[in-house]
Structure formats: structure tokens, C-alpha cells
From Swiss-Prot:
Its cofactor is a metal cation. This is Collagenase. Pfam families: Peptidase_U32 (PF01136). The gene is prtC. Activity somewhat enhanced by calcium ions, inhibited by zinc and Fe(3+) ions and by p-chloromercuribenzoic acid and EDTA. Activity is enhanced by salivary peptide cystatin and reduced by salivary peptide histatin. PANTHER family: PEPTIDASE U32 FAMILY, TRNA HYDROXYLATION PROTEIN P. Homodimer. One of its GO terms (molecular function) is peptidase activity.
Length: 361
């Protein structure tokens, strides 16, 4: 899939990144190099790495490296050290050893391999690790699957009973190790003013409507700040939209000086709506702007909000304005029927059709 994904990204003018940020042991070196070689061949924009071995090899073969939060850099001097090391590796690969003098660095700047100031990337939205992306061993201890090797079993997301010396403690919330999700859209202006140039969104294992909604909201927020239209009304609208997709509740993280974390009060998502599978795409009539679907589960009504997803189609979100069954306009469609509805974009065979429903607490 790597080559196909990279090709799609290039065709759409989107950068692609590959995470190679697990703990790497000696026996992993061959695999690590083959993965980075594949990233280079596929023309992936950059890898995200935390192990020095991965960063060194990527620099040697000319693959751009972004430092992962797993590297646990917490001060400017640590960042300067990594930046100088990567510059040295790059210079050695380009011009041979002994050509770089650290004193040539401009004072006050932390520069990357090609001499440009290092860009600061920060997470802006999404799930948070209770270990702050550190070396967590809960999953390894309980299930022998290492969170540091890409196999976290999400042990921290469960509810727990707290005991001390045999006494059970009365606590307000049983999810004592499951943080709420990060949300910064209401102070994205402060992050931009601070010099952040790349915003990262945690979206692993999330549905396409999550990626679509969250990326769109933050893109609108950044553009609004740049053109002077960033205001409370817009923030309220984005907040409502972000609440409709997967979340465990939201908080500001530690960005604004908060010293204690905020923990979720539920297992799973707190989104305000959920998607229900309805059917699959059959055909699209481009001249009419109409798509044919086969209803495979439940019902579809006029006025329902739907999402259509597919590997090529991406995400289409809209309301059902009309339903036609056997050339007749109907109020609803039921399982087994082949129906047509107006759709603003092309739908492809086997695209999945979902209905958005208000989530029951």
C-alpha cells in the first residue's frame, strides 16, 4: 500500500510521512533499513523517527527526517544537539568527513541538516498518551505487546478500582489513566504566534470522516487567523463539528500552563453522533448528478445526513434531499432496495454509505 498511498498524495499535492519511531534493536537493523529504502523508493516526503540508528541511516541515503515526539526532547539544548548531529551526518554524506565546523552555526538559531532553522512541530488535536509518549510498559507487562514497538494494547484506557493497603478508595472517576483528547483550535493563534509551523493531528485507526472533519476545521482556523477572521463565533462552530467525531472529551493539554491532567469519564468515544452502515454504491450518473445505492442494512430517510467513503472517492458528507425507488419519489428506503439519490460528487461501485445518527448516551 505504501507506493499507492504515496502516489495518491503526490497526485493531490499532499505530503506523505512514514512513522519509523519504534524502539529498534540490533536484530531490527536490516528491517529498519529496508523500510526506509522503501520509503525513499516510494518518494515518501519524510520519515518520522526517534531512534538514532533510523535517523542516521535516513540521512545517509538522503531521506528527510522529522523528529518524533517519542524522542522525548524537552529542552532547546537537546534539540540543538540532535540538529548538530544530523547536520554532521548530512555533511559527511554529501561532502565527506571533516567539512563541518559547528562554530559556523549562526548564534541563536537551531538549524537542521541543510542549514535552515529547525521548524517546530506540535500536536494540535487528538488522543494523548498518559505516559506523554514516553517509554510506557503497561501493555508489555500485561499482554507482552510493547507500546514502544508499535503494539500498544491501550491498557490505560480501561476503568480501574484503586486500592491502598487492602482498602478500596472512593474516587470520582474510574478511568484514572485515560486522558481526554487534546484540542487547541481555540488558541491556535497563540501557537502560531509562538512560532509553530507544523501542526500534527493524532488520527491513527480513525475513520475517513474523522480525518476529513478535523483537518478541515484546523485548516479553516489557520486560514482564518491569517486573514483576520479568527473569532469566537468561528471557534464555537468548529467546536461543534469536532464534537461529532471520535473523542474522549477535550482539554488544552499542558500548553497553557496547566499542571495536572484531565481524565476522561467514559470508555470509548464521546462524539455527539455516530455513523450507521446503510449500503454500498452501485453506479453514478454524472450527467444527472445522481448515485445508485443498494440498501443492505436499516433504513434511509429524506433529511438524513450521510457520509459516503471509498479509497478513491475519499469522503462525501451531505444531506439526503430526495430518494427515488423504481423511478418513484419515496420518503424512505429499506433493506434490499436499490435507490438513487442526488450526490454532489462522483460515487464509485462498492463505496460505503453510512447514515449519521444522534448518539445515545
Amino acid at each position: 500500500d505504501l507506493y499507492k498511498i504515496a502516489e495518491i498524495c503526490r497526485d493531490k499535492g499532499v505530503k506523505s510521512y512514514l512513522t519509523v519511531n519504534t524502539v529498534i534493536y540490533d536484530e531490527d537493523m536490516t528491517l529498519m533499513r529496508s523500510v526506509i529504502d522503501a520509503a525513499q523508493k516510494a518518494q515518501i516526503s519524510a520519515i518520522i523517527a526517534s531512534d538514532v540508528a533510523a535517523m542516521t541511516y535516513a540521512n545517509e541515503i538522503g531521506v528527510e527526517v522529522h523528529l518524533s515526539t517519542q524522542l522525548n526532547i524537552s529542552n532547546a539544548e537537546a534539540l540543538r544537539f540532535i540538529a548538530l548531529a544530523m547536520w554532521s551526518y548530512w555533511q559527511r554524506a554529501e561532502y565527506g568527513s571533516g567539512t563541518y565546523n559547528p562554530r559556523d552555526h549562526r548564534q541563536g538559531h537551531i538549524c537542521g541538516p541543510k542549514g535552515h532553522p529547525v521548524r517546530i512541530e506540535m500536536f494540535a488535536h487528538g488522543a494523548l498518551c498518559m505516559a506523554v509518549s514516553g517509554k510506557c510498559y503497561l501493555s508489555l507487562h500485561e499482554h507482552n505487546t510493547s507500546a514502544n514497538r508499535g503494539a500498544c494494547a491501550q491498557i490505560c484506557r480501561r476503568g480501574y478500582t484503586v486500592k491502598d493497603s487492602g482498602l478500596e478508595l472512593d474516587i470520582e472517576n474510574q478511568y484514572i489513566m485515560s486522558p481526554k483528547d487534546l484540542k487547541t483550535i481555540h488558541f491556535i493563534n497563540k501557537m502560531m504566534d509562538a512560532g509553530v509551523r507544523v501542526f500534527k493531528i493524532e488520527g491513527r485507526a480513525r475513520g475517513p470522516e474523522y480525518v476529513y472533519t478535523v483537518c478541515r476545521c484546523y485548516k479553516e482556523a489557520i486560514e482564518a487567523y491569517c486573514n483576520g477572521t479568527y473569532d469566537e463565533e468561528s471557534i464555537g462552530r468548529w467546536d461543534e463539528q469536532l464534537a461529532t467525531v471520535f473523542n474522549r472529551g477535550f482539554w488544552d493539554g499542558y500548553y497553557l500552563g496547566q499542571r495536572l491532567g484531565e481524565w476522561t469519564h467514559r470508555y470509548g468515544s464521546g462524539r455527539t453522533r455516530q455513523k450507521t452502515y446503510v449500503g454500498k454504491g452501485i453506479k453514478y450518473f454524472s450527467r444527472l448528478g445522481v448515485a445508485e445505492f443498494e440498501i443492505e442494512s436499516g433504513e434511509l430517510h429524506i433529511g438524513d445526513e450521510i457520509v459516503i467513503t471509498g479509497p478513491t472517492t475519499g469522503v462525501i458528507i451531505q444531506k439526503v434531499e430526495e430518494i427515488r425507488y423504481e423511478l418513484q419519489t419515496v420518503e424512505k428506503a429499506t433493506k434490499g432496495q436499490r435507490i438513487s439519490i442526488p450526490v454532489k460528487e462522483k460515487v464509485r461501485p462498492s463505496d460505503k454509505l453510512y447514515r449519521f445518527d444522534k448518539r445515545e448516551e
